[in-house]
Amino acid sequence: INACFSSAGCWVALDRVRDPGNLGTILRTADAAAAAGIILIDDCTDPYSVEAVRASMGAVFNVCLAQATASEFSNFCQIWQGSVIGTALPASNDYRQADWSSPLVLLMGNEQAGLSEEMMGLCTQLVRLPMKGRSDSLNLAVATGICLYEMLKV
């Protein structure tokens, strides 16, 4: 994992993402937003599955991919010189108020469970995306895209 981080910028770390459509959409959005790459933590779906490749519209071949266990990612966060921004429903900070300057890792959790307590503990900032309507959360790929484009404002 350390070898991938020779370039600064924004990395996206995905913890236990299961849906290949979500992963492909995140890959496509990360490519469009010029993210430095994607870190797949623990048991993520295969980025080279037919559905993920299709959803990525081929962006899977343009984005640097790294695989890490939760333990490896945790060890990496201890020496990482940048921010780790995680999204979590219980967070009190609005994503628009976060410090999105590089270098940073955007840490996104599993579709059903979100970020584990362990992963939240690795974050230098925890943010939420406010829900104005009746829905209590957004699709993982949509939430990731919103955060990536907020990062582009910096």
Which role fits each region the language model picked out?
Residues I1-A91:
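RNA substrate-binding interface of SAM-dependent RNA methyltransferases
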Residues I85-S135:
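Active-site/ligand-binding-proximal alpha/beta "capping" segment
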